[in-house]
């Protein structure tokens, strides 16, 4: 299996309670507290829990990632394994309502905004565009990350068809960073046109 953004889903009917609200609500927080120990026990990080409701049906979307000190992406095999673990946890959830649900488990993928220090750690070695609060925006390769901020080696554009030049390293404190986004490097794409560690196929179970 390739390392990739991956997804697995399974359909269930859960035992018994009341109404579920939309994403980023107390029910999502409750499920996060329920599922996080299982995610951590499998050496993963629980990035997010989102609940979408459509009539009598609900979708529980769980986003998992590798710990910040690891490199690469979450493989489809890992997604499939953690999906089974989380499915069992939801089936045995004493606080669940009676509506059927789909469980979707995925990894963040290359398009995730870099909004937390751990996101920057996970993106080390990648090229990112950083919008700063004051001053010019910076596009460069993430060289290092520490408690204070991010050090990038700027990519300086030259003539079309020529490889960009590297500038002097720039240290950006976290409190100066508005947003960050990893840029796709086409030279790193696999034969199917996908970045092997960050984008990829979906899997349904």
From Swiss-Prot:
Which stretches does the entry tag as region Disordered? 1-24, 186-205
Q: Enumerate the UniProt keywords alphabetically.
A: Cytoplasm, Ribosome biogenesis
- Compartmental location: Cytoplasm
Name of the molecule in the record: Ribosome maturation factor RimP
Q: Check the record and name the SUPFAM superfamilies matching this protein.
A: YhbC-like, C-terminal domain (SSF74942), YhbC-like, N-terminal domain (SSF75420)
Listed Pfam families: DUF150_C (PF17384), RimP_N (PF02576)
- Point to the regions of Polar residues compositional bias: 1-12
Domain of life of the native organism = Bacteria
